[in-house]
UniProtKB/Swiss-Prot annotation:
Gene3D superfamilies in the cross-refs: 3.30.2130.30, RNA methyltransferase domain (HRMD) like, Vaccinia Virus protein VP39
Record's subcellular location: Cytoplasm
Name of protein: Ribosomal RNA large subunit methyltransferase K/L
Lineage top rank: taxon: Bacteria
Gene: rlmL
Domain THUMP: residue ranges: 44-155
Species assigned in the record: Legionella pneumophila (strain Lens)
EC number: 2.1.1.173, 2.1.1.264
Catalysed reactions listed for this entry: guanosine(2445) in 23S rRNA + S-adenosyl-L-methionine = N(2)-methylguanosine(2445) in 23S rRNA + S-adenosyl-L-homocysteine + H(+); guanosine(2069) in 23S rRNA + S-adenosyl-L-methionine = N(2)-methylguanosine(2069) in 23S rRNA + S-adenosyl-L-homocysteine + H(+)
GO CC terms in record: cytoplasm
Protein function: Specifically methylates the guanine in position 2445 (m2G2445) and the guanine in position 2069 (m7G2069) of 23S rRNA.
Gene Ontology molecular function terms on file: 23S rRNA (guanine(2445)-N(2))-methyltransferase activity; RNA binding; rRNA (guanine-N7-)-methyltransferase activity
Length: 707
């Protein structure tokens, strides 16, 4: 007897799946983007469940019929002989997909199907199956399209990518059947038969290496699965099933070489070993903690297969370019005679490899469209797009501009004891970056390109940027840090973007300051306010100085070194602790200074303290949950300035600054106070190209205004 089946798969794998299923004995009747339809006997069905490496689900088609309305769906499900599929004492669940004019909700559709099944059994013997949505013994699929209802029984009960060996995964897990597809596209079974080795330098939890070992050793992926729905199928033949399982176990064969996985994260390497042990392939594989540039082949011939990180946003993509350049260099230098298969969603990262692909295949990692690039690593496949490759005409213009800026600003920075400064700020509009130097590091902040710029053009410019910057500035590629600068909303301004906690010390005049180039979009030091900070370095000893919205209190460090007594207010405990570290770094006695964690607006309303100098530099916008209200600097600057002026001694000075480019000072403030726009005096040499980086005002009471 033959059964009608539908075997689903990940998008893009349908024809690869068709070949696999034909090899396992399925008579294919139709191929669709969702999967493969076919006819199979019971032994073939069991072999599909045991041996398919690519399938998601294997569904036994039970019946189909016209059913536009609720009553028709219920009638079809009541009339079907469910006792030929399972008995009433089994637990069930329904997955419903599709809709009609009357049935628009999948939960409602599932309820109708379930009611039909229950009513059938009640009429048959007065009993009914129970529903278990979490772990049913019988999973029924119902699909309604064009008023045709198709109902099927899930023979395994869950997706076949769940082999049973992976209890935990790394940050970006690759599904087992997608990993298997990568290996099949890379011709791994044929290569393994010839004694080739295998190496995954980004192994994570080990999925690719484990799947490769199971293929090479001819281990059926279904052997590890427990509690499958076919065990509860009324037509299940346990003796035949066990016979085929035994035959599968007998087909396992040894490997001539160990397959290798490496990763820089020791925790995921340990996880990979645990997964390999559960899969029964631990003797066939080897997992080590190793950096990419330390990777070396263990055999003369082999396959490098990997799923490196490939960020989904443009800023993430460009930050990964150096990693892909290093991968290309390592493959070309150390893996001659090998094959390679590399999965990425980004053409710019594929290009950054600098190696020519023989073939490309489209695969989907979840919803993300990716390309698998298959390469032959040989002397004929020359390495391109390396840091030393010839520059395009546009890239050469960028190089010339950076070199010119470097020659000018380096001398100025040395003369003024400055080790952190802006060297480039979208000087050439097509290369929309700001580049800041911190000692021997460069932080590249990529302005989000307008929607009118095609993604491939933006990515090409990004790749050229990363090619040019190390060469023009004499900076090692590993010391480039790429971030994407965009208009920030709410708490985004201070949100973490990483967890490296790598700090550095920079110099600014007499002050030493701590910066973190990795963990946040901002580094802990606003370079454009340097001249304001240096102005505070000239305060008289004993000056009472308030730094409101103090951030890491770098301005206060300069003031304290001059002998001022500082009060530093900020809502963030993280930044206040950072501020205290800045003070300690400069051997400043903390007992003479205050670090207060408050909502600055609320604190200014209630404090009775008075100050000689106040620096007020609020964010342009903030909606932090810990604030009593949303801060919008254009709307709120009048009240903030009034509150700050209340805290000044009669002859005191308020310096108000904002980075809101379109900021307009409310005219009434000039009627109430003596206001001087000192923005030009606060723009240092490295920001002359972008004089609108901030607005700065000196505000005093009218009778203390400068004559």
């Amino acid at each position: 007897m033959n059964y009608s089946l539908f075997i689903s798969c990940a998008k893009g794998l349908e024809y690869l799946l068709e070949d696999e299923l034909k090899g396992l004995g399925l008579h294919v009747t139709q191929v669709s983007p969702q999967g493969v339809y076919g006819e199979a006997s019971l032994p073939v069905i069991y072999n599909l469940c045991l041996w398919s490496r690519l399938a998601n689900r294997i569904q036994l088609i039970l019946f189909s019929g016209h059913a536009a309305k609720e009553q028709a769906v219920h009638q079809l499900c009541t009339d079907f002989h469910w006792q030929t599929v399972f008995t009433h004492d089994k637990t069930i669940a329904i997955e419903f997909h599709g809709a009609s004019e009357q049935i628009r909700n999948t939960m409602f559709g599932a309820q109708i199907v379930k009611d039909g099944i229950v009513d059938h059994f009640r009429r048959l013997n007065g009993s009914r199956p129970s529903v278990d949505k979490e772990k049913p013994q019988i999973l029924i699929h119902a699909h309604l399209k064009n008023d045709i209802l198709t109902v099927s029984f899930d023979l395994v009960g869950y997706s076949l990518h769940q082999r049973g060996y992976r209890k935990k995964a790394g940050k970006a897990p690759l599904k087992e059947n997608v990993a298997a597809a990568m290996l099949l596209r890379a011709k791994w079974p044929e290569l393994a038969a010839q004694g080739y080795g295998l190496h995954d330098p980004f192994c994570g939890s080990g999925t690719l290496v484990i799947e490769a070992a199971m293929m090479a050793a001819h281990i059926a992926p279904g052997l590890l699965r427990q509690d499958q729905s076919l065990q509860y199928w009324a037509r299940h033949q346990s003796s035949l099933w066990e016979k085929l399982r035994t035959q599968a176990l007998q087909q396992v064969k040894p490997l001539a070489v160990k397959l290798v996985g490496t990763d820089t994260d020791s925790k995921v390497v340990a996880l990979a070993r645990s997964n390999a042990e559960r899969a029964g392939v631990l003797p066939l594989v080897e997992f080590n903690t190793l950096s990419l540039n330390a990777c070396r082949p263990g055999t003369k011939r082999g396959l490098v297969v990997c799923n490196p990180p490939y960020g989904e946003r443009l800023g993430e993509v460009t930050q990964l370019v150096p990693l892909y350049q290093q991968l290309g260099t390592t493959l070309h230098t150390c893996y001659q005679g090998w094959q390679a298969a590399i999965l990425t969603s980004s053409p710019v990262l594929a290009k950054a490899l600098g190696l020519r692909a023989d073939k490309q295949y489209t695969l989907y990692n979840g919803p993300l469209e990716c390309k698998l690039y298959c390469l032959t690593l040989s002397a004929a496949n020359k390495l391109k797009n390396t840091p030393n490759a010839p520059l395009s005409d546009n890239a050469q213009m960028l190089f010339n501009r950076l070199e010119k800026n470097r020659n000018h600003l380096q001398k100025w920075a040395r003369k003024n004891q400055i080790t952190c400064y802006r060297i480039y700020d979208a000087d050439l509009p097509e290369y929309a970056y700001a580049i800041d130097i911190y000692n021997d590091y460069a932080v590249l902040q990529e302005y989000a390109p307008p929607a009118s710029i095609p993604v491939h053009k933006a990515e090409k410019r990004s790749l050229e940027m990363l090619q040019v910057v190390p060469r023009a500035l004499g900076i090692h590629p590993e010391k480039l840090i790429v971030k994407q600068r965009k208009q920030q909303k709410g708490s985004e301004q201070y949100q973490k973007i990483g967890k490296t906690s790598q700090r550095q010390i920079v110099t600014e005049g007499k002050a030493k300051l701590i910066v973190n180039l990795y963990d946040y979009l901002d580094t802990g030091l606003f370079l454009d306010h340097r001249l304001m900070r240096l102005k505070f370095a000239q305060l008289e000893q004993g000056t009472r100085f308030l730094n409101c919205f103090c951030y890491t209190a770098s301005a206060s460090v300069h003031a304290a070194l001059a002998g001022a007594l500082t009060t530093n207010v900020d809502l963030s405990k993280t930044y206040l602790l950072w501020a205290e570290d800045n003070f300690r770094l400069n051997d400043i006695n903390l007992s003479k200074h205050q670090f207060l964690q408050y909502d600055c607006k609320e604190w200014m309303k209630t404090t009775r303290d008075k100050f000689d100098v106040i620096f007020l530099d609020p964010p342009s916008f903030s909606n932090s949950k810990r604030m009593s209200d949303i801060l919008d600097i254009q709307r709120d600057h009048v009240s903030l300035i009034n509150m700050a002026m209340r805290l000044l001694n009669p002859d005191g000075v308020l310096y108000f600054s904002t980075n809101l480019r379109q900021f307009k000072l409310e005219p009434m403030l000039k009627e109430k106070y003596a206001v001087q726009d000192i923005t030009p005096q606060t723009i240092d040499q490295d920001f002359k190209r972008n004089s609108k980086i901030h607005h700065c005002f000196k505000i005093v009471m009218p009778h203390f205004a400068d004559n």
